[in-house]
Amino acid sequence: MSAGRNNPLRPASDRRFFPLFKTGVIVPEANTEVFLSSWSSSNESLFDGQFFKVIQFYEIPSGDVKNLLREAGVTLLGYLPRNAYFAAFNQDFNAGMLTGAGIRSIWTIDVDCKLSPDLYEGNIPDHAILEDGTVNVLVNYYSNLDPDQVVGALQGQGLTVIQRDDFGHYINAAVSQNEIRAIAALPFVVFMEPVYPNPEPENYTGRTLHRTNAIATDHGAGRHYDGTGVIVELQDDGIIGPHIDYQGRILDQFLSNNSGNHGDHCAGIIMAAGNVDPLGKGNAFGADLYVYGASPNYPGFSAIPQDYGNLGVRITSTSYSNGCNAGYTTLAQTMDQQVRTYPSLMHVFSAGNEGTGNCGYGAGAGWGNVTGGHKIGKNVIAVANLDYADNLASSSSRGPAHDGRIKPDCAAKGSSVYSTINPNTYALKSGTSMACPGVAGTMAQLFQAYRDNYAGNDPMAGLLKAILLNTAEDLGNQGPDFKFGWGRVNALRAAQVIEEARFDSGSLAQGATKTHTIAVPANVAQLKVMIYWTDYEASVNTTWALVNNLDMTLTDPSSTTWLPWKLSHYPSPDSLNLPAFRGIDDRNNMEQVTLDAPATGTYTVEVVGTSVPQGPQTYYIIYEFIPQEVVLTYPLGGESLVPGESELIRWDAFGVSQTFKLEWSANNGQSWELIAEGLAG
């Protein structure tokens, strides 16, 4: 059959059947009857007793249809928007059983659709050309195959295997440029792309800005979520330490080089104890750390399948880049797959320091410049860079992701962060490199908060991420935006959601609907409701990263239905800078509805499985009630304040209609002195 390039003369009704590949849009013929009646195994390229096709359905197949295909000897693999899947056919599959399965088209994927745009166009990036002139590529293969067989077959074709990732189903290899298309044509190859660039590196006021001080207080009556018992993995520039702030809590370092103090600084932001200088205390000063180098090729990520179970790693922190708005790469796919497979794992990344750069999104300089495919993943966290007063650094990378999704995810302090460098001293550094470990440390604190409140059980990482995003302080434009993401992290509000169990969960198959109810009390300044799901990893071939699409609405006691916030992703500065508006979101794996001054009563959340090709899909509903009150968050009591030094006083206030004043007492409240008045919420 033929699967031609998109013809603009095709009727618009056909567009729902146009698979979206990175090198173009394919228009497959409706050929199922012809294929099933005339196919022959002698015409197929077999590998391990199988041949591989793309199957496109008229509608997303149900679980019963998928089971029928398995019984017939056909296994659906990665999803391709729209309504299509890679599929493995046993050489003796039962063609008759596929009749009536709602299959529109079956075809062999073209070599062009197996290549990244760079390889397709012959534009090999300099970083991917090795000294001998060969090209360093990543070769993706089908997930149901034996990695040893694939490696052997590639070596038989003359490839030099540099590294393999059996979990991610890809191989790092060297190939001559004139053999690229021949390798892509092999039946077991799904996709090829150049290796990503070598990784490049990209706190006292940070703790109070994030409100992490408020959940790890210095007085006995407060919260004490300091990350104790939580294990974080750091990938950076070399050996960490020596520094007394890490004493006994760096469990192992899987590297032998030391090329700077970038990693020391990031480690301190995560977990420094502040032993030499209390101002250098990290966010999760009770957490433990494993250390890997970031170069070459992020070895810590390759070790996750072992380290998650054997070492107990639950959070990773990586403040390194690998290309600018690189799209949904092999590494992005692997990150999403790891978080889906290991449900209490969360990867945290810096968004990047290319805020004024132009990375080809189409809107010119200043947009679409998040630095690296791994940060573009759906199930991970990418962090923007703020100063102490919630101002965005001009260097902080902006979204959207290549396909219009919201990035960065959230924001944290990354400018002039005071943290450890070796030996036993401290320094100020700036960048999203510093914001990333701040959020990794905050996540470690929230991880402990969940364990402490739920019988020692680990939280699902998707739930914790959703709580972090839904409780973030909205900055910039109303709602989410492409600069701050969902806002600046607020650990205090996140911990309160955990303690008060303001969340629910469910699971949906294709086309199903579920409802949840929320009882909203009086005197709420703002209601925030978010749905989040850890999405299935996308196929690297496609331009569209979202696989399972759920849709949420919120209905208030007066029966008014509210849609979630969404953003315009049209590639122009004016469009990308517009405030969020209410609408149906089909790109992101999270949606949020907010209502100011909500009426007291019962609200209904409806969730629809609009498109669930890799289901059933688990999701989380998180809700927050922001009260009409002023909450002091620093100082809280017990802090050691240095005479003569300036201190920032921080509070949270939303929906407070009247102004208020700030006073302090030096004699336990017997008398008060004015600091400021006429303050507004």
Each predicted region: which residue ranges?
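Autoinhibitory N-terminal propeptides
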Residues: M1-R223, V230-V232
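Subtilisin-like serine protease catalytic core
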Residues: Q149, I215-G300, L311-R314, N325-Y328, ...
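C-terminal edge strands of extracellular/lumenal beta-sandwich accessory domains
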Residues: L463-K465, H516, A545, L554-S558, ...
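Substrate-binding/access-modulating region of protease and related hydrolase catalytic domains
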Residues: D146-G152, G156, I171, N178, ...
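C-terminal subdomain of the subtilisin-like protease fold in secreted/lumenal serine endopeptidases
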Residues: G280, Q448-V524, T542, A580-G583, ...
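Catalytic-core environment of secreted peptidases
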Residues: Q235, I239-Q247, N385-P437
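Short amphipathic, basic-aromatic surface patches that mediate peripheral association
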Residues: A525-A545
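Hydrolase catalytic cores
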Residues: A294, A412-Q478
